[in-house]
């Protein structure tokens, strides 16, 4: 799964037992930047 977090770094979407790990930064066509996270399972 992929998590998209806005520039404020406060809004992440992950499963309840998931953990977001940042691995890239992308930009949308509207020129707004987003952090790209990979959701990994966690205990």
Curated annotation (Swiss-Prot):
Disulfide bonds join 3-20, 14-39. InterPro entries: Snake_toxin-like_sf. It comes from the Eukaryota. The keyword Secreted applies. Expressed by the venom gland. Keywords: Acetylcholine receptor inhibiting toxin, Disulfide bond, Ion channel impairing toxin, Neurotoxin, Postsynaptic neurotoxin, Secreted, Toxin. It is found in: Secreted. Its main location: secreted. Coiled coil: none annotated. Transmembrane segments: none annotated. GO terms for cellular component: extracellular region. One of its GO terms (molecular function) is acetylcholine receptor inhibitor activity. The keyword Secreted applies. Belongs to the three-finger toxin family. Short-chain subfamily. Neurotoxin. Blocks muscular nicotinic acetylcholine receptors (nAChR). This is Venom protein E2.
């Amino acid at each position: 799964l992929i998590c998209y977090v806005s520039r404020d770094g406060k809004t992440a979407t992950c499963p309840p037992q998931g953990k977001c790990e940042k691995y890239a930064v992308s930009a949308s066509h509207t020129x707004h930047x987003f952090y790209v996270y990979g959701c990994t399972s966690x205990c």
